[in-house]
């Protein structure tokens, strides 16, 4: 198995027996982790606020239905 390291480094991938594995820099990995954690945090906040929002909407409907 021979690897053309200059070409593969230029592409940013490592070819091992026909399987391409992406090589990411630590900054890219940190950015991806931050994005995932932010999405999880926002999702958790929405889940916790959803019952309050639904109660508020129901209360507004009751007030203005009369």
From Swiss-Prot:
Stated name of the protein: Holin
Subcellular localization, as worded in the UniProt entry: Host cell inner membrane
Cytoplasmic topological domain residue ranges: 1-29
Job description of the protein: Accumulates harmlessly in the cytoplasmic membrane until it reaches a critical concentration that triggers the formation of nanometer-scale pores (pinholes) causing host cell membrane depolarization and endolysin refolding and release into the periplasmic space. Once the pinholin has permeabilized the host cell membrane, the SAR-endolysin is released into the periplasm and breaks down the peptidoglycan layer. Determines the precise timing of host cell lysis.
Topological type in the membrane: Single-pass type II membrane protein
Domain of life the protein comes from: Viruses
Subunit text: Homomultimer.
GO CC entries: host cell plasma membrane; membrane
Disulphide connectivity of cysteines: none
GO biological process: killing of cells of another organism
Lineage: Viruses, Duplodnaviria, Heunggongvirae, Uroviricota, Caudoviricetes
Residue ranges of the TM segments: 30-50
Major localization class: host cell
Keywords assigned by UniProt, alphabetized: Cytolysis, Host cell inner membrane, Host cell lysis by virus, Host cell membrane, Host membrane, Membrane, Signal-anchor, Transmembrane, Transmembrane helix, Viral release from host cell
Periplasmic face of the membrane: 51-66
MF terms (GO), sorted A to Z: pore-forming activity
